[in-house]
């Protein structure tokens, strides 16, 4: 996702409202006008300074956000923000409650209201993805036309990494889909037998979600993430550039175009 697209997404109310909530306590503390009216301590100068406990909470929040963002496979600024909102709001609720229990309760109610009114925006761009609703149909489609290459994303609806990868996969499908290069998705949470067949763990601690497998002539030829020679799972960042390069989408697209039948007018010219 380009910076231009990310900045356009940031203009949506969901993001800037949640950013304000994420920095609300720090903003209130450092804005003199707000601080002197909300926080009543021994002196006005002390009221607007963060004490040691507040600093500890903020540093702990920073560490948690960094760790969780890496675990969820965040590869863009939007992904980092979306994955950090929950933790920043929890930390702010603790900080507001630490200052005054009523402030903490009011902040929680505000977060609930924002969550109801402003849900996270989903990808609404073009896509050419086949969603397999049946394991048998999935296997039949792979074997139906051996000339067609399939790039299949195995996912679950609840996994944050799968959610982050969804718009990336959709954009790639819109760019590279042809009659002989197709993109598909199958929810292994609904079809555990498929997960078992392709050796993909769908547990809540799984590091294999999402898994993307390239099928050529009905057989698996490559996958990410994969295991090394020692049987250790190699971490893979599902960015658009990484997926293009790893699976050679440009070359696959070129080969798929060459397999297309020649149009009648073009055939006459060749003759």
Curated annotation (Swiss-Prot):
Domain Thioredoxin: 112-262
Extracellular side: 29-102
CC terms in the record's Gene Ontology section: endoplasmic reticulum membrane; mitochondria-associated endoplasmic reticulum membrane contact site; mitochondrion
InterPro entries assigned: Thioredoxin-like_sf, Thioredoxin_domain, TMX2, TMX2_thioredoxin_dom
CDD domains: TMX2 (cd02962)
Membrane topology: Single-pass type I membrane protein
Positions of transmembrane segments: 103-123
Top-level taxon: Eukaryota
Record text about domains: The thioredoxin domain lacks the 2 redox-active cysteines, suggesting that it lacks thioredoxin activity.
Protein name per the record: Thioredoxin-related transmembrane protein 2 homolog
Native organism: Drosophila melanogaster
């Amino acid at each position: 996702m380009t910076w231009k697209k990310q900045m356009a997404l940031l203009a949506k109310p969901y993001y800037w409202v949640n950013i304000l909530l994420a920095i609300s306590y720090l903003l209130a503390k450092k804005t003199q006008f707000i601080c002197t009216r909300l926080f009543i301590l021994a002196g006005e100068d002390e009221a607007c300074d963060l004490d040691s406990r507040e600093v500890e909470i903020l540093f702990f929040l920073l560490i948690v956000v960094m760790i969780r963002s890496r675990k969820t496979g965040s590869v863009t600024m939007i992904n980092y923000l979306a994955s950090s909102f929950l933790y920043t709001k929890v930390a702010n609720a603790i900080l507001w409650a630490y200052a005054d229990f009523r402030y903490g309760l009011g902040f929680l109610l505000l977060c609930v209201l924002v969550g109801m009114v402003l849900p996270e925006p989903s990808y609404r761009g073009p896509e050419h993805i086949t969603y397999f609703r049946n394991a048998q149909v999935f296997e039949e489609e792979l074997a139906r036309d051996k000339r067609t290459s399939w790039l299949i994303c195995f996912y679950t609806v609840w996994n944050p990494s799968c959610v982050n990868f969804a718009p990336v996969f959709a954009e790639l499908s819109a760019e590279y889909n042809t009659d002989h290069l197709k993109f598909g998705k199958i929810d292994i949470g609904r079809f555990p037998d498929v997960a078992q067949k392709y050796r993909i763990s769908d547990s809540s601690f799984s590091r294999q979600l999402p898994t993307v497998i390239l099928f050529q002539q009905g057989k698996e030829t490559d996958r990410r993430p994969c295991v090394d020679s020692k049987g250790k799972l190699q971490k893979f960042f599902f960015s658009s550039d990484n997926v293009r390069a790893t699976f050679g989408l440009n070359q696959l697209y070129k080969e798929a175009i060459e397999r297309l039948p020649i149009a009648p007018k073009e055939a006459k010219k060749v003759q």
